[in-house]
Amino acid sequence: MYYPEYIRKLSVRGSVSMSAREQVLMKIIANLRRFGIDISNSKFKDKDIENEVVMTVYIKDVREYMVCYDFIRLEQTINNSQWSAAYTSINRLEENARELGINSFFKSFDGIRGAIIQKNMRSAKQSLVVVNNKKTQILKYMG
């Protein structure tokens, strides 16, 4: 499903034509929006979000966030009952998600944070599984 501004951009005909690369980038951005990742709510909101360079940088930043070491560190700190380090990791992940306009993780992050505060390893791991499943889906659609 494409959002209206992307449909408008994709349907431009005549003297202005989009490159194949721009079409692929627009499709990736539209897929990201389906997962609650919106470039217009990110640190790029003041830039021309239909610019090929801006879209490329944004997609690269989202991809890097999805595979960043902080997710692995969070899992390790929870498994080792290092609650203070886990709390720091979840705060850093949430801050980075907010910068990139990734809203789909906030509910899960709140669940992980609550489990960390209660020192409930089982609940924290269950919430982390939800986050990891979402990450896998997002990365699959990003190509």
Regions found by a protein language model. Give the residues of each.
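Two-component system phosphorelay core
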Residues: 1-88, 92-94, 98-143
